[in-house]
Amino acid sequence: MERDDCRRFQDSPAQTTERRVKYKPKKKRAKDDDDEKVVSKHPNFRGVRMRQWGKWVSEIREPKKKSRIWLGTFSTAEMAARAHDVAALAIKGGSAHLNFPELAYHLPRPASADPKDIQAAAAAAAAAVAIDMDVETSSPSPSPTVTETSSPAMIALSDDAFSDLPDLLLNVNHNIDGFWDSFPYEEPFLSQSY
């Protein structure tokens, strides 16, 4: 009788079914709509990421190595993307995936495949973007004050960033006299007079 109970117990469907545990990957936390808007505001470029404080950095991995070439920190994503394009062309050649493939022939080329030369060429490309951005942000129509007889020195002087600052030294001479008057004048102590 005991055997029949054991057999019945073993043959019962509750005991014969295996308990299978499926691996379920952890779900990513659902982002709020506000977070998605913030993420989608800045462009995504290959080899470019944004720091928490708003600066953009660019780096590229050296082929067949785990190390990376640091290309720099930039104020805009476009500058960092152009720096990455220069490095990608230098390292991978024509098979490189570029952020701006239409501008490949305008980009500076490094003197060699040395990381220092690649960094220098990347910095030059980023600086060219900064110059292009300055030209675009300036007035689109030519300035009426600049004439053909203006010398290049006068144009450079008018474009000087410091020319827009207020004259901070205007009243310095008037205030300096009052500054020295606030100190009491005393004769120096000489030990020989005693």
Swiss-Prot record:
CDD domains linked: AP2
Subcellular location: Nucleus
Function: Probably acts as a transcriptional activator. Binds to the GCC-box pathogenesis-related promoter element. May be involved in the regulation of gene expression by stress factors and by components of stress signal transduction pathways.
Organism: Arabidopsis thaliana (Mouse-ear cress)
Cytoplasm listed as a keyword: no
Start and end residues of each stretch annotated as Disordered: 1-40
Cellular component terms (Gene Ontology): nucleus
A molecular-function term among this protein's GO annotations: transcription cis-regulatory region binding
Similarity remark: Belongs to the AP2/ERF transcription factor family. ERF subfamily.
Keyword Nucleus recorded: yes
This protein's name: Ethylene-responsive transcription factor ERF038
Domain of life from the UniProt record: Eukaryota
Annotated keywords: Activator, DNA-binding, Ethylene signaling pathway, Nucleus, Transcription, Transcription regulation
DNA-binding region: 44-101
UniProt-listed GO biological process terms: ethylene-activated signaling pathway; plant-type secondary cell wall biogenesis
Highest classification ranks of the organism: Eukaryota, Viridiplantae, Streptophyta, Embryophyta, Tracheophyta
Biased composition annotated in UniProt, kind: Basic and acidic residues: 1-10
